Amino acid sequence: PEDGADSVERSGDHENSPYFAHPDVYNMESTDTLTVLHNFKTMQQTSEWSCGVTAALMVLNWYGKLGDWNEESLAALRHSLDGTELESYPGTTLNQAIDIFNGVGGFDIVSTKDYPDGIWMDDIQGWLAEGKPVMICWNDFGGHWQTIIGYDTMGTENTNDDVFLVADSYDTTDQNQD
């Protein structure tokens, strides 16, 4: 790999980092406060633009539909942005993410387009409880896709201390590239 998080595979890891705890999220199991997708396999993107398709690859793998799909073959399922204000944007828009899952087939897609009043923590908790990963994206700094795979209420009624567990295909910031 020449670019993306995969190009620095684990070079910044510190097993006993004094700054980050490294729970074994892959082997975690749900509890009375934690809902987690047990044994969700993460992947690292191999280019700077491929977070969206890599998030989709992780979801395909979760559902046993990975097959021969890879970053490039999923990217080819996206509609062109030529002639739009995003013409030179290399990443994946929400509509293009929908293209990917429609192209692979066999998915019932739910997106923010289906929720004009917004998606809330209760919605995400519900989908996780049903065993469904939740792809999320934001537009800051050019945009980035991640996949929510867990949610912990921390045993309190207050949502201010709640925690999302997120599979990040560009996982280079916590000294444990998992």
Label the predicted regions.
Residues 58-65, 151-154:
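Active-site catalytic microenvironments for nucleophilic, acid-base chemistry
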Residues 60-61, 68, 174-176:
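Short, solvent-exposed loop/turn elements at domain surfaces
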